[in-house]
Amino acid sequence: FGMKTKRKTWYLQKKDILYVEENHDGKYGAKGQKRLPKRKTTPEDIQRVNRWNKSKKAKIRLMEYFSPGDLWATYTYKPENRPPDMDTAKKQFLAVMDKLRKIYRKRGRELFWIRNIEKGTKGAWHIHFVINDIGDTASLIERAWPYGGVYVTQIRKSNCPEEDFQKLADYITKDERTREKKKDGTLAKPRVSESSYSHSRNMPLPEPVPKELKRCLLYTS
């Protein structure tokens, strides 16, 4: 008997990377089996799906536009320099990226970035972001930030890049509803009271190539 599966394939980094996603088509089931009654969708279900989609899109962009050697950075604020609101923090980050874009352009390079601005539950602000490196980007982003500390690390080459980019995508899309697991398995209280996720406008989401598969299921007595 047949069961239909939908496959989506993303060809990333000029086809150097293939990312494949497969989902069972809920419209079809195995022959002779009754479909389960549809469960009512809860607000928690919607939040979970929205978070999953947000993280997935971030991961695909990370895999398409960034590579090992690019940078994962954090901007922090001294207490006296904390922004009064999210709009101010957005403008401050964009002002830095505008400066960097001009430098990149002079060198014949394009600037890509993904960022998440977070205000902690205790009032501290910081900005996590990924940016493509052109050799001295670490020193460029450090000199351009006058409001506090700068922490930079390289994205390292990995045997499991898809898993690593998934972790990075989950981290950079945190919001007020994100609760991390504690060692005892319980969920910690949210550590973010306000957040804003965004990316540079020159990073369109690659389109997947869809394909419908029919799987044969064998039943034996």
What do the predicted segments below correspond to?
Residues F1-G123, D133-S221:
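Right-hand nucleic-acid polymerase module
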